[in-house]
From Swiss-Prot:
Organism the protein comes from: Schizosaccharomyces pombe (strain 972 / ATCC 24843) (Fission yeast)
Protein name: Uncharacterized serine-rich protein C2F12.03c
A matching Pfam family: EST1_DNA_bind
Keywords: Nucleus, Phosphoprotein
PANTHER family: SMG-7 SUPPRESSOR WITH MORPHOLOGICAL EFFECT ON GENITALIA PROTEIN 7 (PTHR15696), TELOMERASE-BINDING PROTEIN EST1A (PTHR15696:SF0)
Location of region: Disordered: 48-86, 795-822
Length: 891
């Protein structure tokens, strides 16, 4: 950095400090105004004295009722009381005008503070990173005022004062709309000002949506400024965007410059006036700005916009709120930074609220994920499956705040899986009519709760029942694709969280060994049944019949279409493909030492059969570009798929969504609708083959699919983000999170300290209300040295040490999780898949005696088992015989 640049950076830093200190001073004034406004809402003036509004309202209603009940009979004193009532109404009108005046002061003060703090983000990114300005702005200004109005509206609704309630709702909606406008315009300004290539599709979308309306309503255009007429389109957009959200820039273009530069000679101003052309010219705001922080600002803004739309939905329709718009912005955030995990938690909160207030959906049968008849309790658990899966995903995210908050929400949601029985009955008991999903969740609820060890010992029959129901439901095609994906997310996340059940504050493992075994065995059982069911749908006849060389012209040109014959119409196979893709992606990035022999054998057989099919039908193998399109089918796929990311952003996915005019960028909020079922299953099969092929190439033995164990790291640490340069500020505000502090009955006894109020979060989930916790500032994450890449963020979730053990220096030489789950026999009854060596060590090496089916001829030779040099390899002989069988059947 040159001396001039250093001087300019010092000037911009001091300017930001000045604005930050001024905004901090105004916050005390805002707090005082809110207190006065609260007093105005809760009291009225009677005879020159303030009295509680509830008491005054009761007396007024009682007198009106007395007059109406005796309207035919003259009542003594009624005529004389009319002037008094008129005076009281006049005083209330004066009080109402005073309230409106105070609200105007609050609104203008909030705009001024927003203008000061928002300007620092654009003046000096380094300063905003150190102070975490965006979180500070949301927590101390926007969320504080929103929470204030939510409480006042609730109090007014209990006081039966329609006039006060109507005025408060109007003010609340006005403030929410202004907050949405600020964050939406901030995203457009960041994209227009810094030209982030990784976010160009998203920022282009916001700029195109925000700019036309902003330019038409801009004061610069209304005043007919000469600068406006001579400026370029980009400069016009910037000027209009600045003038729409910054109070100081609503009069002249020079005020925009003063807001961002602070002095006429500063060259760090993004907007500068050219004396020759008398127009605005663009200059970079900083030479050392951090793109990672700007990406995080965009991500946070999307989360905040989704939160505000959630509050709007609650105000407009308290009984049955529509969270569709909020869900749309959370999905946008997932496409920007899928590894941050906050969007999963917010989506889980929405699913909890929808499950509470969706009686009409359950009555129509649309919320059920099974095609059979299930009882009311099963329907309730099926409705809870999306929320539990989102909480599971958020719990394993590298974001400390999101993970610790989601663990509490997850525990509360799993407790509800036990039903309404509080008589101490055995939770392992079940009804024969119970569905596979409800019992599947029941197993994890038992494992992740402080259930008596005797109950866990009795879980053998329940375990076998779940295995049987899963197998029968998969083979019968009773599961939908979304249900299987959600169950897959639960299974993978539960395996990650299982080693952390029962850790004490000292880092020592408590009596949770049975819980650990039950959680891990449930996960392995699920994937064993899943892989076996997929193999049963891939027989030789299905892989060789019905293949046509005709190419469908209606198929998307972005992905080359392959012909899969009769598999394209297999409705039973289709829902099981994406869950296997998720499993393969997880093992590809984080290791697969936990896989049992049956899972490894099943995956190798699926890969061999698909390879044989493509080889013998003379079709080109798909490439990894198909993963971009496949990842748009579920936001959980973005979290697991090995997509190319720039600053944590899957840019290819954003580009495909933007240029394809698909969700979440369209206003209707509808996903990419593909009516052709052949196209859907083709994408899924291509993605599965690509992932299995990548996994085979990344391991020395393509059949065993073994990989070295995952490094010992804490899943809830911030190490993944220090590699991005994001260690000096908090990753995300927890304004809308339930408490991060584990409850006394929670199985997670350690973790990140809580900064939220626990009681309100529990009430939020128990009573179905979206009550956000009032929290303080987020503690920054200490910087740690790491060499990880952005692409391996999820790897932090696979760990053998507790968070408390990492912080205190305590390390365990060996843990149950460090070994394969196949080394543990079932608690009650052994499974054939749980095989071990005589010495108890797991079989993570070559699979002895495994038969490789449908191996393509030109594939590399396998080293699974040794053969004499004089004999040809067995898989070549088998492939030749299979090919002759195919030729005979065709002739």
């Amino acid at each position: 950095m040159s001396a001039i640049d250093s001087c300019e950076h010092t000037v911009s830093w001091k300017l930001c400090e000045q604005k930050y200190n001024e905004a901090t001073t105004l916050l005390s004034k805002l707090k005082k105004l809110l207190g006065n406004f609260k007093e105005n809402c809760t009291s009225v003036v009677v005879d020159g004295h303030k009295k509680p509004r509830s008491e005054s309202r009761k007396k007024y209603d009682a007198k009106k009722q007395h007059q109406s009940s005796h309207f035919a009979t003259p009542v003594k004193g009624v005529e004389s009381s009319e002037p008094t009532e008129k005076k009281k109404r006049n005083k209330e009108a004066l009080w109402l005008r005073a309230r409106q005046k105070k609200w105007k002061e609050i609104f203008e003060l909030c705009q001024k503070i927003t203008s000061l703090l928002g300007g620092t983000i654009l003046i000096d990114v380094s300063f905003s990173m150190e102070k975490d300005v965006l979180t500070y702005l949301w927590m101390r200004v926007h969320y504080q005022v929103i929470s204030f109005f939510k409480h006042r509206i609730y109090e007014a609704s209990t006081q039966h004062d329609p006039e006060l309630l109507s005025s408060l709702v109007t003010m609340h909606i006005q403030y929410l709309n202004s907050t949405i406008q600020f964050y939406t315009t901030l995203i457009a300004i960041i994209g227009e000002l810094y030209h982030l290539q990784c976010l160009s599709p998203l920022t282009s979308f916001f700029t195109s949506c925000v700019t036309p309306k902003t330019i038409l309503e801009s004061p610069l255009r209304k005043q007919g400024s000469h600068n406006w007429k001579t400026s370029t389109n980009s400069q016009s957009r910037l000027a209009a965007l600045f003038s729409s959200i910054f109070e100081d820039s609503c009069l002249e273009v020079d005020s925009v410059k003063r807001l961002l530069s602070g002095s006429p000679s500063s060259s760090s101003s993004p907007l500068k006036k050219d004396s020759s052309s008398n127009s605005l010219t663009y200059e970079p705001a900083l030479t050392d700005h951090k793109p990672q922080y700007l990406v995080l600002c965009v991500y946070r803004s999307l989360i905040y916009i989704g939160d505000v739309h959630r509050y709007l939905a609650e105000v407009r329709s308290p009984n049955v709120p529509d969270y569709q718009v909020s869900r749309r912005y959370y999905v946008m955030a997932a496409n920007v930074a899928p590894d941050y995990g906050v969007h999963f938690h917010q989506l889980g909160l929405i699913e909890v609220a929808d499950a509470r207030s969706s009686s009409r959906k359950s009555s129509s049968g649309q919320s059920s994920s099974l095609k059979g008849n299930v009882n009311v309790e099963d329907k309730r658990l099926i409705q809870a499956l999306p929320a539990i899966s989102f909480f599971f995903l958020s719990s394993i995210s590298p974001n400390n705040v999101a993970a610790s908050s989601a663990k509490t929400s997850l525990f509360i949601a799993l407790k509800r899986c036990f039903g309404k029985t509080n008589d101490g009955s055995n939770p392992c008991l079940y009804h024969k009519e119970s569905s596979a999903i409800s019992l599947f969740l029941r197993l994890y609820a038992i494992a992740f709760s402080n259930t008596d060890a005797d109950y866990i010992q009795d879980s053998g029959p329940l375990f076998k029942r779940v295995r049987f129901l899963l197998s029968e439901s998969l083979k019968s095609g009773l599961f939908s694709e979304s249900s299987l994906l959600q169950m897959t997310y639960c299974a993978l996340a539960a395996r990650v969280l299982a080693p952390f059940i029962g850790f004490s504050d000292s880092g020592e493992h408590g009596e949770s060994y049975p819980n650990l075994k039950l959680a891990t065995q449930t996960t392995t059982m699920f994937f064993e049944v899943l892989s076996d069911s997929v193999n049963s749908q891939l027989p030789l006849q299905a892989l060789t019949s019905g293949v046509s060389s005709k190419k469908d012209g209606n198929f998307d040109d972005l992905v080359e279409r392959r012909q899969y014959g009769s598999l394209s119409s297999n409705a039973v196979l289709m829902p099981m493909l994406l869950p296997l893709c998720v499993l393969t992606s997880s093992c590809l990035q984080n290791g697969d030492v936990w896989l049992t022999k049956d899972i490894r054998t099943g995956l190798s057989q699926i890969f061999n059969r698909l390879s044989f099919f493509l080889e013998n039908t003379n079709q080109t193998a798909p490439d990894d570009s198909v993963l971009v399109r496949c990842s748009s089918k579920s936001i959980g796929l973005l979290f697991f798929f090995p997509l190319v990311k720039v600053c944590g952003v899957p840019r290819d996915t954003l580009q495909w969504l933007y240029f394809s005019n698909h969700y979440p960028f369209n206003e209707e909020g509808k996903g990419p609708q593909v009516d052709d079922s052949d196209a859907l299953i083709t994408i899924a099969l291509d993605s599965l083959y690509v992932l299995l092929n990548m996994r085979a190439k990344s391991t020395p033995n393509s059949t065993s699919f073994s990989s070295p164990p995952t490094p010992h790291r804490s899943p809830f640490s911030g190490q993944a983000f220090t590699g991005m340069g994001l260690s000096n500020y908090s990753l995300m505000s927890s304004s809308s999170f339930p408490s991060a502090q584990s409850s006394p009955t929670s199985p997670f006894l350690s973790g990140t300290p809580s900064i939220a109020n626990q009681s309100s979060s529990i009430a939020s989930l128990q009573f179905g209300r979206m009550v956000d916790s009032l929290v303080g500032p987020v503690q920054p994450i200490p910087a740690q040295t790491t060499g990880c890449s952005v692409h391996s963020l999820q790897q932090r979730t696979f760990s053998n040490e507790s968070p408390r053990a990492v912080d205190s220096g305590f390390s365990r030489t060996s843990t149950p999780f460090s070994e394969s789950t196949s080394s543990y026999p079932l608690v009650s009854g052994n499974l054939s898949s749980c095989e071990t060596h005589l010495n108890g060590s797991p079989q993570n090496g070559h699979l002895q005696g495994e038969r490789v089916l449908f191996r393509p001829l030109r594939s590399p030779a396998l080293n699974t088992f040794s053969t004499p040099a004089t004999e040809p390899p067995e898989h070549l002989v088998l492939s030749e015989l299979l090919k002759k069988m195919v030729n005979i059947s065709n002739n």
